[in-house]
């Protein structure tokens, strides 16, 4: 930022995933707000191991760094031995014949992984990208996913559509030499209500079921 301040921020209980607390507590525009700050870094881990690693890096990183965490207890995906460089990502189930890429971060990574399992049962090969570094985003991994899948991407985020993960993905690919983009951007639309986390993810259209439907539709488009 202009002041060249070194500020580390952690935002918890964000997104419809928080459940019963309701929309006044969901902070569905936090990623957009911090992404807009010049030179900022925005991180969104999906499990405890990734969170621990990124917190350590925050302490050693100058500038304005924001880390968004989730409220619920989610399965641990990564070992503590894994590294999570700022500006990186993790690819799950990637292969040379993938038909679609599912991009998520935080809670929606778990939904993307569940969706990939269901798509595999339907005969559709899907890679999953954990975009834990929302800013800077891993542009090269996105470009490679486009090259393999014919630019079929489903981006799912627990955030309003403006300025969050979907915007970061599209901005990264806007000037890239990739096939014509076929992107399904699943994000929270309108004002959520109060309920169980799974109910609210489903109502917002960002659950694994919606990700599967979006991916299947993209795979029908030639």
Language-model features, listed with the residues they occupy:
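Conserved thiamine diphosphate
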Residues: 1-101, 110
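Thiamine diphosphate
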Residues: 18-19, 68-222
């Amino acid at each position: 930022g202009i002041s060249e301040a070194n500020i580390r921020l952690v935002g918890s209980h964000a997104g419809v995933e928080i459940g019963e607390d309701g929309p006044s507590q969901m902070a569905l525009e936090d990623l957009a707000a911090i992404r807009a700050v010049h030179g900022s870094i925005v991180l969104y881990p999906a499990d405890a191991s990734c969170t621990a690693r990124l917190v350590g890096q925050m302490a050693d990183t100058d500038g304005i760094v924001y880390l968004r965490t989730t409220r619920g207890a989610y399965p641990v995906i990564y070992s503590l031995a894994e590294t999570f460089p700022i500006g990186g990502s993790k690819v799950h189930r990637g292969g040379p014949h993938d038909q679609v890429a599912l991009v998520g971060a935080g809670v929606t990574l778990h939904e993307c992984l569940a969706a990939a399992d269901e798509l595999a049962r339907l005969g559709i090969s899907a890679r999953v990208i954990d975009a834990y570094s929302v800013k800077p985003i891993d542009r090269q991994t996105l470009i490679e996913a486009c090259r393999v899948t014919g630019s079929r991407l489903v981006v799912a985020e627990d955030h309003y559509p403006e300025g969050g993960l979907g915007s970061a993905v599209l901005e990264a690919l806007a000037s890239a030499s990739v096939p014509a983009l076929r992107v399904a951007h699943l994000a929270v639309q309108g004002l959520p209500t109060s309920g169980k986390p799974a109910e609210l993810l489903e109502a917002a259209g960002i659950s694994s079921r919606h990700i599967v439907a979006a991916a299947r539709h993209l795979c029908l488009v030639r």
